[in-house]
Amino acid sequence: MDLFTIFAMKLLTYNDFFDSVSSALTSWTGKLQGLGIAVIIFCVCIIAFMFMFGEGPSRTAKKWLLYIVVGGVLLWGAGTFASTVQGVTAGF
């Protein structure tokens, strides 16, 4: 075997594509969850002020609250999905 073949075999054994993708997904969703919690808290504070200021802003606040809850569920669902994919593919 020549040097290039040995290098290619070592590269393929240490840098499996699926391991790289699953670890990147886990890393990204972890960072998004950290940022997401700050954004969710900020938006909930804005919604609280909107509820205090009367009828019109209160209707808008109810819509925003639904969007924030759905967004939070999607954000944490993506993190859980990435962890599940990483756990399932770890055996292969």
Swiss-Prot record:
Q: Does the keyword Membrane apply?
A: yes
* Biological classification of the source: Bacteria, Bacillati, Bacillota, Bacilli, Bacillales
Location in or out of the cell: Cell membrane
Going by the UniProt record, its keywords in alphabetical order are:
Cell membrane, Membrane, Plasmid, Transmembrane, Transmembrane helix
Cellular component GO terms, alphabetical:
plasma membrane
According to its UniProt record, what is one Pfam family this protein matches? TrbC
Q: What highest taxon heads this organism's lineage? A: Bacteria
Topology in the lipid bilayer is annotated as: Multi-pass membrane protein
Q: What is this protein called?
A: Uncharacterized protein pXO2-18/BXB0017/GBAA_pXO2_0017
Q: Which InterPro entries match?
A: TrbC/VirB2
Ubl conjugation among keywords: no
Task: Name the source organism.
Answer: Bacillus anthracis
Transmembrane feature ranges? 34-54, 65-85
